[in-house]
């Protein structure tokens, strides 16, 4: 327990965790995280090896470090059931942090430009997510997005090269109007591709 996140929160407070990069986040236009875990008091966990949760107050770790938004479309957003997911959304809302993912898209106004973001959880369905990619990008366009960023939770852990599903969905996203594709889940860096003039970062690591 002494080396756990909980112990460090109790000992050092919410400001401890991003202290070395907070100044960077404060200077940028938009800071987005992929949040793998839940902010909930639920106790019935999913049947899986790793399940993550924390109290709602832990949202202050993000809000106090200039994090504006969180992608929740990943394999840990429902670790303690459906309510843990909605609890997380509520906790982030209360902390002033926008969230998006699955069928929930978000528009931010950054220096007068409407930036649209969406999160796609690819791991279970692979190419079946294509229709959601199209639908979400269409929704962002309809909402007036001038720049569209698509976050994919995809790929294989500890693999340094993207697989064919990643490549196909990334290309589809850009063909449909995305300006930037960002990937996560492998926990390691994967390649960056320039496709039709737009960048695809297949995995940002951790």
How should each PLM-predicted stretch be described?
Residues 1-206:
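Acidic, metal/ion-coordinating pockets
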């Amino acid at each position: 327990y002494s080396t756990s996140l909980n112990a460090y929160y109790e000992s050092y407070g919410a400001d401890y965790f991003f202290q070395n990069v907070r100044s960077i986040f404060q200077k940028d236009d938009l800071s987005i995280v992929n949040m793998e875990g839940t902010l909930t008091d639920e106790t019935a966990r999913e049947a899986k090896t790793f399940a993550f949760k924390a109290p709602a107050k832990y949202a202050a770790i993000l809000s106090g470090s200039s994090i504006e938004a969180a992608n929740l479309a990943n394999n840990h957003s429902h670790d303690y059931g459906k309510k843990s997911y909605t609890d997380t959304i509520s906790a982030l809302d209360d902390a002033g942090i926008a969230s998006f993912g699955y069928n929930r898209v978000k528009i931010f106004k950054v220096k007068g430009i409407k930036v649209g973001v969406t999160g796609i959880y690819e791991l279970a369905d692979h190419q079946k997510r294509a229709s959601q990619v199209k639908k979400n990008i269409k929704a962002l366009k309809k909402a007036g997005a001038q720049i569209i960023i698509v976050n994919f939770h995809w790929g294989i852990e500890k693999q340094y090269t993207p697989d064919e599903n990643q490549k196909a969905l990334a290309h589809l996203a850009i063909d449909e109007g995305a300006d930037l594709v960002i990937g996560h889940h492998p926990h390691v860096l994967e390649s960056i591709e320039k496709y039709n003039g737009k960048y695809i970062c297949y995995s940002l690591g951790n």
